[in-house]
Amino acid sequence: MTHLRKSHPLIKIINHSFIDLPTPSNISAWWNFGSLLGICLMMQIITGLFLAMHYTADTTTAFSSVTHICRDVNYGWLIRYLHANGASMFFILIYLHIGRGVYYGSYTFSETWNIGVVLLLAVMATAFMGYVLPWGQMSFWGATVITNLLSAIPYIGPTLVEWIWGGFSVDKATLTRFFAFHFIFPFIIVALVMTHLLFLHETGSNNPSGLNSDSDKIPFHPYYTIKDIMGFMFMGFTALLLVLFSPDLLGDPDNYTPANPLNTPPHIKPEWYFLFAYAILRSIPNKLGGVMALLASILILALFPILHLSKQRSMTFRPISQCLLWVLAANLVILTWIGGQPVEHPYIMIGQLASITYFLTILILMPLASLMENKILKW
């Protein structure tokens, strides 16, 4: 008799995805981030659901309702800070996951990679809308500044902005719709994640060598389930460390002041995980140019499969490309730092140089390095 997990229509899908899945025997801890992101997404949906039970999406009571959650709801402070810091954890894991994909050439699975880019955009949109909900100063002004960027679109821009606002400024209508979208988006993300996995399981996982691993596969369970559990423990420990000891470390103090349309904060800036893109946006003096650069900074990921000119898939045996990838990583750290600084000398110049370096490295230097390595290896 066939085992139930191999015959039952529903359990069979889970079996082929997480139990009997043939997996390369040499994948490293860098392959843990996918499952960690899955757990993180589940945590965000659960904590978010409990927060939504007590939150009111109204400009007069939104700020008070968040305060009420922290003060009066049983373990409300824990749920709120798990949700806020969970977003930071999510982005740390996403950036590491993307970095792994770039280093090991996982972007050659173009369908999986492109769905991943769509996922990144969806997660960024969700995080932005979530940041508006507590209705603090930075929530309000962040929403005003970022939505206002759409007015740079020729002809339809101003109308589009007012349509998104639901009026002539960020107000009650904006908050209500942002709450509605923030609630529904994670479920769209879950659907996208399933598509992401569907396409990944069509080809099988990549591995550190970048070579075909069909001849050496092992079942996902128990080898990688136990390895993933170690990742969960590390992530859980880090999240609790953050939530219980310094929950406001990554937040903005301005968001503890209720939103006031008559008083602009001295430095309007988004959460830390958007700062690199914000720095690129600010480094271009023209509004439309800045918006285009902002979009390009994320959408450039979709070009990786085209820009891959090396005869090898992974960077494991390509030291020049490795150096450039670390230059790119350092450059992103610099952009993140600049995004949080005021718009004054010397930060403007550093931001502009870092923005140029970002695009130059990806579009020109890395493909050139690949060609050079091919030449050196006489391939």
UniProtKB/Swiss-Prot annotation:
Cited InterPro entries: Cyt_b/b6_C, Cyt_b/b6_C_sf, Cyt_b/b6_N, Cytb/b6-like_sf, Cytochrome_b, Cytochrome_b_C_euk/bac, Cytochrome_b_N_euk/bac, Di-haem_cyt_TM
Topology in the lipid bilayer: Multi-pass membrane protein
SUPFAM superfamilies: a domain/subunit of cytochrome bc1 complex (Ubiquinol-cytochrome c reductase), Transmembrane di-heme cytochromes
Chain ranges passing through the membrane: 33-53, 77-98, 113-133, 178-198, 226-246, 288-308, 320-340, 347-367
Binding site for a ubiquinone: 201
Subunit structure comment from the entry: The cytochrome bc1 complex contains 11 subunits: 3 respiratory subunits (MT-CYB, CYC1 and UQCRFS1), 2 core proteins (UQCRC1 and UQCRC2) and 6 low-molecular weight proteins (UQCRH/QCR6, UQCRB/QCR7, UQCRQ/QCR8, UQCR10/QCR9, UQCR11/QCR10 and a cleavage product of UQCRFS1). This cytochrome bc1 complex then forms a dimer.
Function of the molecule: Component of the ubiquinol-cytochrome c reductase complex (complex III or cytochrome b-c1 complex) that is part of the mitochondrial respiratory chain. The b-c1 complex mediates electron transfer from ubiquinol to cytochrome c. Contributes to the generation of a proton gradient across the mitochondrial membrane that is then used for ATP synthesis.
Protein name per the record: Cytochrome b
Organism: Myoprocta acouchy (Red acouchi)
Taxonomic lineage from the root: Eukaryota, Metazoa, Chordata, Craniata, Vertebrata
